[in-house]
């Protein structure tokens, strides 16, 4: 019985740690630093946070450059057809996730036209983003999550958390973008559903 409780704790600790470490990477490095340039850091620290983001986000690693450009597009085009992830143009949360994924891939692969201004001063480490965002690396992360659960999960339902690990970044983004627009609040009047 002691072993069962230990394994449950390991799964719980792993899930909570992955959730918050990934959320911090997205909030601190991708959102506040990359998209909004709320503070500055030297190139060495930038690379430290690229690596931190890769470890924390794992299979859902997002290029800070692409994230920053998309987030700037979101602010510039809030609640219009050009907004890369407004719930106003999605019938449900899943269609918004799929649309956002296609927008992200389009910006990443340069199949969607993006104004140069949206790329201004964004952190850029091309080879690292290419490696960290590759399908092979994403699959290796997914396998690592599955192996962790094989070793420590004590019941079948714990494996239902594995897809959340695999899609952690998009899950965070969806929660913020769907629910903040649908049920959030504002401190001042805005002419869109941003909250």
Label each residue range with its predicted role.
Residues 1-174:
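Non-catalytic, topology-defining segments of multipass membrane proteins
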Residues 160-195:
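Alpha-helical transmembrane anchor segments
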């Amino acid at each position: 019985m002691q072993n069962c409780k230990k394994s449950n704790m390991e799964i719980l600790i792993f899930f909570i740690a992955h959730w918050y470490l990934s959320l911090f990477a997205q909030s601190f490095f991708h959102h506040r630093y990359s998209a909004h340039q709320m503070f500055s850091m030297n190139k060495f620290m930038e690379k430290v946070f690229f690596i931190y983001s890769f470890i924390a986000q794992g299979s859902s690693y997002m290029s800070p450059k692409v994230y920053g450009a998309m987030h700037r597009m979101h602010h510039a085009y809030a609640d219009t057809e050009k907004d890369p992830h407004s719930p106003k143009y999605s019938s449900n949360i899943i269609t918004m996730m799929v649309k956002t994924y296609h927008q992200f891939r389009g910006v990443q692969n340069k199949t969607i036209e993006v104004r140069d201004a949206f790329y201004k001063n964004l952190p850029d480490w091309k080879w690292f983003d290419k490696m960290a965002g590759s399908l092979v690396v994403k699959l290796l992360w997914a396998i690592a999550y599955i192996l962790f659960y094989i070793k420590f999960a004590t019941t079948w339902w714990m494996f239902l958390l594995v897809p959340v690990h695999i899609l952690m970044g998009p899950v965070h983004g969806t929660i913020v973008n769907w629910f903040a627009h649908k049920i959030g609040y504002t401190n001042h009047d805005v002419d869109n559903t941003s909250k």
